[in-house]
């Protein structure tokens, strides 16, 4: 969708020399993310595109663009690296894509804390902080390409969540600076619990221009593959390792057969028909970790030392939603779900779902910390047939007590929230009174407007 009646030349004159992209091929590319993982979203979002892309390099330039967009009532969709999976950065109403990738500085690093610009890539932040003994607490499998602003705006957790929980947990985001889209745009600072007003809001509640993020101790992480002959043994190994508080770990990713067969680069380490655990464990914990592997009947088939972490394959790039990416590279009919199972050391519900669905819903678990307990989240691979069948699978999971964060919707509240966040809606009314920021994504705003 574009805005044919707007005088774009006048708009461009109002923002001066800030970089603008008008080439249609580039604009269409920068209007998309990985929405096509979903056969439901693919037809809904395929034709959505911005009118142009603007790339500011500073907060001052963001203010200039904000002023121009408010004056012309132009929709604004904020973009980091476009690595989201359900249309978070796809413009539904045309307008401007505000690409913040040029705002990529690390302003300062202190013990346990860093101040960064939104376009800073996660791996680039670690490159600055790790020599000082610190690292970002968690990151998605798109670690090398994703930006911190995009992760905060559209993500929820990832590698590191087994220790630190999810992004919205108190303490995982310290402060943000935000530019508003009022008649006179201003800069406001949110600290402490106030940050939840923009955390995981798809950029609907202001333009983040700076973030203070807590850091964790930087450990030497070994990457390990452990294989099992039985899936439930692999899943129990994941639970026991997660519950072993004295063992320091960053990633516990469990994959039922045939998922490991989709990992082309890892095939030398994955025997045919095996079930696999892809892991990151601190090197000081390896001795007792190996004893646990032996107790549970696993076989270590691959190990990469922390000293080689930057070389070659990263195991993290086969976990979380990279699992879906690799699987779809071999079978594009596959899609996925996002499910949170209740804490249960016996994993009875997981076993039931594994046996009930068989290969139609292939079990992929990612362990994370929630309310001081280690729980299995799942990004199951689904053999898609019809939208009705997909909905029936979701309904069955929910009826049996699992929580499904539906990845087949671009509406904020219809995915992982399930309820309208009235505080976020009230905040949007203050900072974006015309509803210009990523319009169409927040149900609470749409219902308020009607």
Question: Regions from the language model: what does each represent?
Answer:
Residues 74, 81, 90-95, 101, ...:
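Conserved glycine-rich FAD pyrophosphate-binding loop
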Residues 20-24, 55-56, 76-80, 98-100, ...:
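General beta-strand structural signal in soluble alpha/beta enzymes
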Residues 1-67, 83-112, 259-267, 307-331, ...:
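N-terminal flexible segment immediately upstream of the FAD-binding catalytic core
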Residues 105-107, 122-123, 127-246:
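FAD-binding subdomain of flavoenzyme oxidoreductases
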Residues 51-56, 114, 222-227, 271-289, ...:
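Short cationic amphipathic helices and targeting signals
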Residues 61-64, 124, 232-237, 284-291, ...:
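Short, conserved charged micro-motifs
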Residues 228-230, 243, 247-250, 258-303:
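A conserved active-site cap/scaffold subdomain adjacent to cofactor or substrate pockets
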